[in-house]
């Protein structure tokens, strides 16, 4: 749905999949690479089982808090250090979490442009078992799906990141 370079090098006349299901209410909430230059990607952690994390005390002990993974190069560029609170935003909303600066999130070279990835684990819900406010990652994700299966696309989307 959203392109970190604003185009599709393999098919320049088509940026978005013509086979996706795009609801009218979503059309004005599509991010651009100028406003949201980084790619957010969601994933689960070993300690998580679906969304049980927020209500099972043992899982909250193992993984107590939402975090964001960013690469060393992007962290340096943004002045973000390990443990800093960061705000990650998309055209649809924003979340706050602690930053984890890592070598795992390396920048990509796409059509001659450096594109940074931001890892955003799916974590808990609005309030965890200890009563702390949490943020829902799906606040950032687009509401679009595959035209045949209606499976939503929550995996990648455009974001920006800044110190909170």
How does the language model describe each region?
Residues 1-55:
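Long, low-complexity segments enriched in small/aliphatic residues
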Residues 3, 7-8, 35, 51-164:
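Long, contiguous, secondary-structure-rich segments that constitute the structural scaffold
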């Amino acid at each position: 749905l959203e392109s970190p370079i604003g185009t599709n090098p393999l098919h320049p006349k088509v940026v978005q999949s013509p086979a996706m299901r795009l609801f009218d209410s979503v059309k004005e909430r599509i991010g651009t690479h100028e406003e949201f230059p980084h790619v957010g990607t969601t994933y689960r952690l070993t300690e998580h089982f679906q969304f049980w994390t927020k209500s099972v005390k043992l899982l909250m002990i193992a993984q107590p808090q939402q975090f964001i993974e960013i690469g060393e190069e992007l962290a340096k560029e943004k002045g973000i250090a390990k443990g800093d609170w960061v705000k990650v935003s998309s055209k649809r909303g924003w979340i706050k979490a602690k930053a984890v600066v890592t070598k795992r999130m390396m920048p990509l070279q796409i059509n001659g442009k450096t594109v940074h990835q931001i890892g955003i684990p799916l974590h808990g819900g609005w309030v965890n078992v200890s009563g702390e406010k949490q943020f829902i990652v799906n606040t950032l994700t687009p509401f679009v799906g595959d035209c045949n299966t209606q499976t939503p696309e929550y995996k990648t989307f455009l974001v920006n990141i800044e110190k909170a």
